[in-house]
Amino acid sequence: MYKLLDTITGPADLKNIPREELPGLADEIRRFLIETVSQTGGHLASNLGAVELSVALHYCFDSPADKLIWDVGHQAYTHKILTGRRESFHTQRQYKGISGFPKRSESPHDAFGAGHSSTSISAGLGMAAAQDLKGSGSRAIAVIGDGSLTGGMAYEALNQAGHLKKNLIVVLNDNEMSISQNVGAFSSFVSRKMTGSDFRKLKKEMQGLLENIPAIGKDILHFARRAENSLKGFLTPGMLFEALGFDYIGPIPGHDLPQLLEVFENVKGLEGPVLVHVMTTKGKGYQPAEENPAAFHGVGPFDVATGKTTGGKPGAASYTGVFGATLVKLAEEDEKIIAITAAMPDGTGLTPFAKRFPERFFDVGIAEQHALTFAAGLAADGFRPVTAIYSTFLQRAYDQVFHDVCLQKLPVTMALDRGGLVGDDGPTHHGTFDLSYLRHLPEMTLMAPKDENELQHMLKTAIYAGRPVALRYPRGAGYGLPLDQTIQSLEIGRGELLTEGDDVAIVAIGSTVYPAQEAAKLLEARGIRATVVNARFVKPLDRELILGAARRTGCIVTVEENALQGGFGSAVLELLADEGMTDVRAKRIGIPDRFIEQGPQPQLRKDLGLDGAGIAATVEAFLTAKGQAALSLVK
């Protein structure tokens, strides 16, 4: 089916293919990617643009001795295919399948794990320093997209790399035209020649000769360097990288394999940090993806002939969609409401806001730290900023939440999308730690809705709370409930009593409330009567409601889609302990102390006992356990 690709089980096989046949291999890989991702879903457009680049890197370097580090991982599919995972590639991002991102435990060729952006240069520099200390002679190559260069960490690494002068190669895969370009035959010619060994040797010899000429030698050398830099600056956009201490090579046409091979072979012999600027086309080779790369950045299963997604049926609105629509509705009535995103306007539901209020919408790029402090600045001057961000990415701005928002008591709303289990993207993207790392911050209010209707009321509550608020909601569709036409503010710190029973109190937060209600029905069929509480707020807790339920039943079970350590259940246990209620038996249900792999959300919840049946089984086993200590901390 694939004449060349079928012969490859690892990088060594790739090197047996004649160079003139490599473009044909790239075509086969591209066809394989389209056919496979159309069935599984995944990050298609970026990977189609990085096929030739990946082939050239593996052809010229020797993985795993040479360390290939892929930033984020959105462009690493060809790398996975060439390193022995083609046969299992149909399982990528699937339950118990291979990861959609580089993963050290998956292959020795995955030198460094990823999923979040802008980390590759730092990791690559560390590996370059390690190779230097070991004297191994291996190279470290960091591949980073131009989008990731909006993250400040990348520049921190570039700055130190230029200072340390280690043998680090940074490949800038520029597929968005966001860096000024000057591509042409002459520029490509100069880039190739400036990396050639003859040119580099001649340059060093001339430098030594000029330095030894009495009186005027250094002046001539200084003039020559200025002339070289002027020429390169005229032809290329690399002066920034040169100023940071890198040898800049490029721009190079990223789909021209002969040029890529020549440049990488030359670069292998260079000393010190080098940046190779490669221009690629996102979605290359598949017309629907080339025409609409944003839609094919992360895509579900689709029909190859038309490019249209398959299997999707109209259903309940997503939490993200309800959030975005509600924010627009509130902003219609309040011109002080501002929306901020960190390079995720579509993913966070802010595109409608951006179109309706472009002057009040800010996309700060992949810069979560800046996003929070930028919001704090707006809040300090009287505005009501709402920063929409995936829960997992807020971890990158923790100090800003503390220092710039909470410490100064500024009214910033943090809308945490993808709170809890996210599904196919796995452990790098699950938002299962936010309740733990936010609830102990002074001045923080932390809430989570049970459904999409409650979400809209909580959003208004957060915006007008006059204090720092984190509003956490899950990925995916809601329950298809009708939305109240009038949006109201909720009383902060007030939960909701859903059902009353005398045997056990189940106190749930956010996405676990409906499963808790389902569990109560299953328990009732077994003769166990449960009180069910929708906590609504992790901080402040509804002390009266929770303590009342504990007194009534003498047995309390908390449920959360968050890490058990320091989470919602821990907050409830602290409340019971502080009130001296040592006669109450307690049990926590949530995410255990491990990273959760990828898989469909319903499957993961079932595995973790977070669906209705699982909660009911845990509660029943807890109630019937013998010798259970009061205020048990047993998971």
Swiss-Prot record:
Keyword Repeat included in the entry's annotation: no
Cofactor(s) demanded: Mg(2+); thiamine diphosphate
Binding site for Mg(2+): D146, N175
Broad enzyme group: transferase
BP GO terms, sorted: 1-deoxy-D-xylulose 5-phosphate biosynthetic process; isopentenyl diphosphate biosynthetic process, methylerythritol 4-phosphate pathway; terpenoid biosynthetic process; thiamine biosynthetic process
Cofactor binding note of this UniProt entry: Binds 1 Mg(2+) ion per subunit. Binds 1 thiamine pyrophosphate per subunit.
GO molecular function: 1-deoxy-D-xylulose-5-phosphate synthase activity; magnesium ion binding; thiamine pyrophosphate binding
Associated pathway: Metabolic intermediate biosynthesis; 1-deoxy-D-xylulose 5-phosphate biosynthesis; 1-deoxy-D-xylulose 5-phosphate from D-glyceraldehyde 3-phosphate and pyruvate: step 1/1
Binding residues annotated for thiamine diphosphate, in chain numbering: H74, G115, H116, S117, G147, S148, N175, Y286, E368
GO cellular component: cytosol
InterPro entries, per database record: Dxylulose-5-P_synthase, THDP-binding, Transketo_C/PFOR_II, Transketolase-like_Pyr-bd, Transketolase_C, Transketolase_CS
Keyword Transferase applies: yes
Annotated keywords: Isoprene biosynthesis, Magnesium, Metal-binding, Thiamine biosynthesis, Thiamine pyrophosphate, Transferase
EC numbers, comma separated: 2.2.1.7
Reactions catalysed: D-glyceraldehyde 3-phosphate + pyruvate + H(+) = 1-deoxy-D-xylulose 5-phosphate + CO2
Protein role: Catalyzes the acyloin condensation reaction between C atoms 2 and 3 of pyruvate and glyceraldehyde 3-phosphate to yield 1-deoxy-D-xylulose-5-phosphate (DXP).
UniProt cross-references to PANTHER family, sorted A to Z: 1-D-DEOXYXYLULOSE 5-PHOSPHATE SYNTHASE-RELATED, 1-DEOXY-D-XYLULOSE-5-PHOSPHATE SYNTHASE, CHLOROPLASTIC
Recorded family membership: Belongs to the transketolase family. DXPS subfamily.
Subunit details: Homodimer.
Protein name in the entry: 1-deoxy-D-xylulose-5-phosphate synthase 2
UniProt lineage: Bacteria, Pseudomonadati, Thermodesulfobacteriota, Desulfuromonadia, Geobacterales
